[in-house]
Amino acid sequence: MKSNAAVHRAVCAAIAVVAVSPIAAHSQNTDQLEEVVITAIVDAAAKAANQQKNARGVTNVVSADTVGRFPDPNIAEALQRVAGIAIARDQGEGRYINVRGGPSEFSAVTIDGVSISAPDPSTRAIDLDTIPSDIVGQLEISKTLRPDQDADSITGAVNIKTQSPFDYEGFRARASVGGSYNEFGGTHDRRGSGSVSNIWGDDSKFGLLFSASYSETDREVDNIETVWGRLTRPEGGSVFGIVENLFKDYNTQRERIAFTGAAEWRNTENDRFFVRGTHSKFTDDEYRNQLLVLWSEGVLLPGATDQTASFRNIRVAKQIRHRIQQNEILTVEVGGEKSFGDLVVDASVSMADTEQTYPRRDELLWRTSALGTATAPLSYDYRNSTLEPTISLFTSNQHLTPTNLSFRENAYRTSTTTEETQALVINARLPVTVGGGEGQFKFGLKLKDGERQADENRFRDRASTAAPSSPLSAFLTTTPSRNYGYDLGFKVDPALADAYFDATKKTSPPRVEQSATADYQADEQILSGYAMWDL
């Protein structure tokens, strides 16, 4: 209220000056102003709020200014601040959105109205961590669908509007840089973005814009996963118990690069032509040290409950994995709008390409022989819910002796998933008056053609000849791997692991069945139309 009052006083003061200055000027025989025009500039956030208020249906509109007030690195994290939207995270960063409590697969995402598909072949949910928040001009979230929107969502649809050269008058250049420090792991995050735009010509009818964004995160992540299952007790009956404990220690480096461009010609509000495009690339380079406690490979001893159990002959494994994941999203759209009297027609042709690749997903696993006996078993105890579960392995520390673990296998996987989509859209609208009320009649057609391909190749070698020439101890660094209160030993040297991967990858036997069943191709053609009367 204080700031609004200050603005009000400033405006009143300006009007007062305008009102008295001609009189003073006249009395001093100076040139008199015939007309004074005061033009107000509406804040982008206020404009978005006005759009939201006047929207047909339940809609949220978020401006770039609002997004920029928070250090959100990607679109998913920017959307989490909208009422009714939650996000699913990966390594601490937002990746998928949930609109009004529905699954991520039930939401559709478009960029400037161009539908995009999920890069991940295993889900329909869109990886929104691929798109940085710096390229946003406006976010539009529709929680109820209208007939003129694609019927490819259930819970809601998100339209990511990129910046336009007509968002501001004249030449404008903007740049920003930022950074942060992560206390856990002592790493840093970096980001920077910039845009330049201008409008030219008679009455400023032609505009160009280019923007770019770059960010990089370096983080360490601890993770504990537990696999549960039904265990058959030797004395009869069964309990719901633990099959595996997975202790994961990640070192991740993520990079996002994005570019947007737009060329627009505007004669009037309903007479315009545009060409625009976006390109986003996300790279996740990850090393994972993992300790696996394989209860399922042991023998359950009598006395097990749903919270405690003892085993003999279990196995423990230590794994290093190097995985690189790359996501790319490209959209290009050419279109325009033209008025013919009261009839307004808009049309566009667009293409959207998405791609996910795993250039490397390399794993090296060492495993112990059977651990635990009937008289000295290994056990877990989950009865104290306020403390970390008690696992006797971390008391006996058998996993900390490198000579207890020997080579088990190497495994390699590469995959590429692509989808190419082309669309043609034509809409028309005509104002109508019914019973003294004004509205519009709107109708349109859309043709969409898409092709999706997935290709995966898997390899694995368990032969003794594939074992590293050096024992596990030679691969270990002096960097401890601790997951919460659990001592996992020392981390594997990533350079030595990569050297082993590069030397053995070509000789690892293919897993033909697993590779073939992961491959597929799907084609889709959709012709749709609608008509609506909006009052």
Language model features: what each stretch is:
Residues 1-31:
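Cleavable N-terminal targeting peptides that direct proteins into the secretory/outer-membrane pathway or into
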Residues 34-70, 96, 104, 114, ...:
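N-terminal periplasmic "start-of-domain" segments of outer-membrane beta-barrel proteins
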Residues 76-115, 143:
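Extracytoplasmic beta-strand/coil segments of soluble accessory domains associated
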Residues 118-125, 134-141, 148-232, 240-243, ...:
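Outer-membrane beta-barrel translocator/receptor signature
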Residues 149, 165-171, 201-206, 269-270, ...:
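Short loop/turn motifs that connect adjacent beta-strands in outer-membrane beta-barrel proteins
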Residues 178, 188-197, 246-286, 315-364, ...:
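Outer-membrane beta-barrel transmembrane strands
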Residues 193, 224-233, 290-300, 362-372, ...:
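Flexible, surface-exposed loop regions and adjacent strand-edge segments
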Residues 304-314, 374-409, 455-519:
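Flexible glycine-rich, low-complexity coil/linker segments exposed to the extracellular/periplasmic environment
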